[in-house]
């Protein structure tokens, strides 16, 4: 991968920094693993905005990614690496010995032609997926399941990883990039190594229109609105909010915790927040 600073031929390109990977496939994606994807623009089934700053953007297909990696004992060869518009990480198209093709999250260091395995007998090598009970303590892992068989849910973004800290009985402790230490069942699966495309965070969008292509709409400050639109709105000229920061619905923001899932609180050994 290379970090390319674009020539300043316009104000938008002057600040642009791109991450170029010449190893990515330049053709069309593998059609049998594509699915249609409709845009909701941040609305729920009632038409109410549940996620702000979403809407528009370029249409794209969803790539069906295998987060379970359940074809145990069958070797798979990396056929090509591809760009995925739905996530920050790149994806890899792998072809198994029985001829089946699947997309997986592309791990760091995995190249075209490399052989990957999954299952309890797989070697400890980047890109291989094993149950946590078979992974040595201290190993860097990614694409971690939270429930056995549900599929990977943690450490899937570009450049992310976690570390297996300990195993106690039927549970293991995993430290995430955020600093949170979480308990995970030892039958949950994880992939060895880090997620690739680690230079994703170094890119610079360059102009507002590039975010509009991605379906991200502008973020308007509450103090710039009218009182009918936001608790911070109103006033003559430029004024302060006049109260502690809140969301448009009056919920405290900037550090206020909104987690309410008490059912899984026992799985968190150490929170990511500093007390």
From Swiss-Prot:
Output the superkingdom of the source species.
Bacteria
Ranges of Basic residues composition bias in the record: 50-59
**What GO MF terms are annotated?**
rRNA binding; structural constituent of ribosome; transferase activity
Q: Where is the composition biased (Polar residues)?
A: 35-46
Q: Which GO terms describe its cellular component?
A: large ribosomal subunit
Q: Which UniProt keywords apply?
A: Ribonucleoprotein, Ribosomal protein, RNA-binding, rRNA-binding
Q: Any keyword Ribonucleoprotein?
A: yes
GO process terms (BP): cytoplasmic translation
Q: Which InterPro entries match?
A: NA-bd_OB-fold, Rib_uL2_dom2, Ribosomal_uL2, Ribosomal_uL2_bac/org-type, Ribosomal_uL2_C, Ribosomal_uL2_CS, Ribosomal_uL2_dom3, Ribosomal_uL2_RNA-bd_dom
**Disulfide bonding pattern of the chain:** none
Stretches assigned to coiled coil:
none
Q: What does this protein do?
A: One of the primary rRNA binding proteins. Required for association of the 30S and 50S subunits to form the 70S ribosome, for tRNA binding and peptide bond formation. It has been suggested to have peptidyltransferase activity; this is somewhat controversial. Makes several contacts with the 16S rRNA in the 70S ribosome.
- Show the NCBIfam families listed in the entry: rplB_bact
Q: Which PANTHER family match?
A: LARGE RIBOSOMAL SUBUNIT PROTEIN UL2M (PTHR13691:SF5), RIBOSOMAL PROTEIN L2 (PTHR13691)
- Record note on quaternary structure: Part of the 50S ribosomal subunit. Forms a bridge to the 30S subunit in the 70S ribosome.
This one is known as Large ribosomal subunit protein uL2
């Amino acid at each position: 991968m290379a970090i390319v600073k674009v020539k300043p031929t316009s104000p938008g390109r002057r600040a642009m920094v791109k991450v170029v990977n010449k190893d990515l496939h330049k053709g069309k994606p593998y059609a049998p693993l594509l699915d249609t994807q409709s845009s909701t623009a941040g609305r729920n089934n009632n038409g109410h905005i549940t996620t702000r700053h979403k809407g528009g953007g370029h249409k794209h297909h969803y790539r069906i990614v295998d987060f379970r990696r359940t074809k145990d004992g069958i070797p798979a060869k990396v056929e090509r690496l591809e760009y995925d518009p739905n996530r920050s990480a790149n994806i890899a198209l792998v072809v198994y010995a029985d001829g089946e093709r699947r997309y997986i999250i592309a791990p760091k260091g995995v190249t075209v032609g490399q052989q990957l395995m999954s299952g309890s007998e797989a070697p400890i090598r980047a890109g291989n997926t094993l149950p946590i009970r078979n992974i040595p303590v201290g190993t860097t892992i990614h694409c971690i399941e939270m429930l056995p068989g549900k599929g990977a849910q943690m450490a899937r973004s570009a450049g992310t990883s976690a570390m297996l800290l300990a195993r106690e009985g039927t549970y293991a402790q995993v430290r995430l990039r955020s600093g949170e230490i979480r308990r995970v069942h030892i039958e949950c699966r994880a992939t060895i190594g880090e997620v690739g495309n680690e230079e994703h965070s170094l890119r610079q969008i360059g102009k507002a229109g590039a975010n509009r292509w991605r379906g991200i709409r502008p973020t308007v400050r509450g103090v710039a609105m009218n009182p009918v639109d936001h608790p911070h709105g109103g006033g003559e000229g430029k004024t302060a909010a006049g109260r502690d920061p809140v969301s448009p619905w009056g919920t405290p923001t900037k550090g206020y915790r909104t987690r309410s899932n008490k059912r899984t609180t026992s799985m968190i050994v150490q929170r990511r927040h500093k007390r």
